[in-house]
């Protein structure tokens, strides 16, 4: 690898501001704000709006809209019953 062109990779704490969920991971992102982790070391803190702890897809609170097809909409519009067995 070429020296001097790659960003510094280090451990940071990602903090979900919605749920206050924290996890430690490696990143090239840095911050002037620091926090003490469970191992007693201080790491930079990166604040997140959404993480796997608060995103509806990962929490199971996601709502799926019923996507009716064109035939179903036509049958519904004219009060016809579908031929599904």
UniProtKB/Swiss-Prot annotation:
Coiled-coil intervals: none
Ribonucleoprotein among keywords: yes
Disulfides per UniProt: none
Transmembrane segments: none
One Gene Ontology CC term in the entry: ribonucleoprotein complex
Keyword tags: Ribonucleoprotein, Ribosomal protein
Pfam families registered for this protein in UniProt: Ribosomal_L31
GO biological process: translation
Keyword Transit peptide among UniProt keywords: no
One function term, GO molecular function aspect: structural constituent of ribosome
Entry superkingdom: Bacteria
Family: Belongs to the bacterial ribosomal protein bL31 family. Type B subfamily.
HAMAP family: Ribosomal_bL31_2 (MF_00502)
Assembly and oligomerization: Part of the 50S ribosomal subunit.
Record protein name field: Large ribosomal subunit protein bL31B
Species of the source: Staphylococcus epidermidis (strain ATCC 35984 / DSM 28319 / BCRC 17069 / CCUG 31568 / BM 3577 / RP62A)
Lineage summary: Bacteria, Bacillati, Bacillota, Bacilli, Bacillales
Gene name in the database record: rpmE2
């Amino acid at each position: 690898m070429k020296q001097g062109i790659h960003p510094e990779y280090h451990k940071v704490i990602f903090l979900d501001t919605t749920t206050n969920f924290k996890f430690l991971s490696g990143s090239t992102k840095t911050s002037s704000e620091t926090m003490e982790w469970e191992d007693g070391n201080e790491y930079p803190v990166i604040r997140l709006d959404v993480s796997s702890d608060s995103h509806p897809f990962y929490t199971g609170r996601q709502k799926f809209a019923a996507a009716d097809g064109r035939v179903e909409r036509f049958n519904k519009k004219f009060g016809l019953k579908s031929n599904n067995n």
